[in-house]
Amino acid sequence: MALLEFFRPQKKATANIAKERLQIIVAERRNGGPAPSYLPQLKEDILKVISKYVNVSPDMITVSLEQKEEDLSVLELNITLPEDDN
């Protein structure tokens, strides 16, 4: 039994190191570098178009660009629409 306990802490340390490294890699891939300079203007333009049809404020819209692969980016647009008062 003592022999197993001797090796057990090393496995946990190795697993923790691997987990930390993986978290760093995932975080770097999510960020994908700085956001494009056109993103704020795009959000403003989208807000203007949506405001023609629905009463929304700028804080109700989030726009993000995520680099999935080297040649693939995903533009994500989330809009919180107000409840319809019929």
Curated annotation (Swiss-Prot):
SUPFAM superfamilies: Cell division protein MinE topological specificity domain. One of its GO terms (biological process) is cell division. Pfam families: MinE. The keyword Flavoprotein does not apply. The keyword Cell cycle applies. Keywords: Cell cycle, Cell division. Belongs to the MinE family. Prevents the cell division inhibition by proteins MinC and MinD at internal division sites while permitting inhibition at polar sites. This ensures cell division at the proper site by restricting the formation of a division septum at the midpoint of the long axis of the cell. This is Cell division topological specificity factor. It comes from Aliivibrio salmonicida (strain LFI1238) (Vibrio salmonicida (strain LFI1238)).
